[in-house]
Amino acid sequence: MAPNLRKSHPLLKMVNNSLIDLPAPSNISAWWNFGSLLGICLLTQILTGLLLAMHYTADTTLAFSSVAHTCRNVQYGWLIRNLHANGASFFFICIYLHIGRGFYYGSYLYKETWNTGVILLLTLMATAFVGYVLPWGQMSFWGATVITNLFSAIPYIGQTLVEWAWGGFSVDNPTLTRFFALHFLLPFMIAGLTLIHLTFLHESGSNNPLGIVSNCDKIPFHPYFTLKDILGFMLLLLPLTTLALFSPNLLGDPENFTPANPLVTPPHIKPEWYFLFAYAILRSIPNKLGGVLALAASVLVLFLAPFLHKAKQRAMTFRPISQLLFWILVANLFILTWVGSQPVEHPFIIIGQLASLTYFTILLILFPITGALENKMLNY
């Protein structure tokens, strides 16, 4: 009998073991779709980004007009740009839901997979930040100025570090060119990290909604989950296309329709919606260095998740108190996102401070205590 090429060819064998004959738990729900959706987001962003880069000029005098030119004169340039800009939003929606799923079902106990995932999140945030600067509108310029300036809070080396990052004494042409280079490079780094992420995942196999070992009940990835993933792709690409075609500027800032002007500061400097929760945490601390540390901690706290797991059960499926805490945390993140979009005045300042305190209290204190408490409850 001739050998099956799919199982014997050195390259096809890898594809087969990752996407076709991969044993997957039979009961994984739609919450397990977001990994493949993130893959589709990445592919879409790289493809549209490549097409945009062909028409973009990374120069302060030309950047804004080159983007306008792409939208006006390039065939379907407006569509490519709208898909790329809104694709970023969908990328973040998917990654936040993916992380939420991991948190709820205790997937973070696969430490290597979880840690590479957090590194992926940080890389994605860096990519989105440098990408937002490229159209060189008002919010691009001032966002870049405000966020890069945060590095100056680092004691002793801060100021030198910022000037080194800027390539001068303010955000200017050298900053724009290097941000374009970084924005081109980082997505490929994300793709590489994704392969590492998957390699670690396939070492252990997927978790499942019950949080128990499922080796006795596995099904092949193809056709079951390939089909389920295709449904997911359709449900992702449909709203993305709808948003890009019907209301492409819904999530953008009107300030970015004005070319960058270092002499005029916009009334409210705020990042895109997906950074607002972290921005609110940054603003809630009246000290510059303290704010920067809180901002870093808001994402880096995810690295601690495996060490803060005190429950005997892995998933929150049968842990109602932890579930309640989890959904309070989700609501709290929505509050932080809303506060981040508001001006710095009463009552938003105090709301932001309370929400920031709640965020860290739930993650660092209440989750471990609740886990231990639920262990006690198992005895009764």
Swiss-Prot record:
Keyword Secreted recorded: no
CDD domains, alphabetized: cytochrome_b_C, Cytochrome_b_N
Principal location listed in the UniProt entry: mitochondrion
A Pfam entry, by short name: Cytochrom_B_C
Residues reported in the UniProt entry to bind heme b b566: H98, H197
Keywords linked to the UniProt accession: Electron transport, Heme, Iron, Membrane, Metal-binding, Mitochondrion, Mitochondrion inner membrane, Respiratory chain, Transmembrane, Transmembrane helix, Transport, Ubiquinone
Protein name: Cytochrome b
Lineage: Eukaryota, Metazoa, Chordata, Craniata, Vertebrata
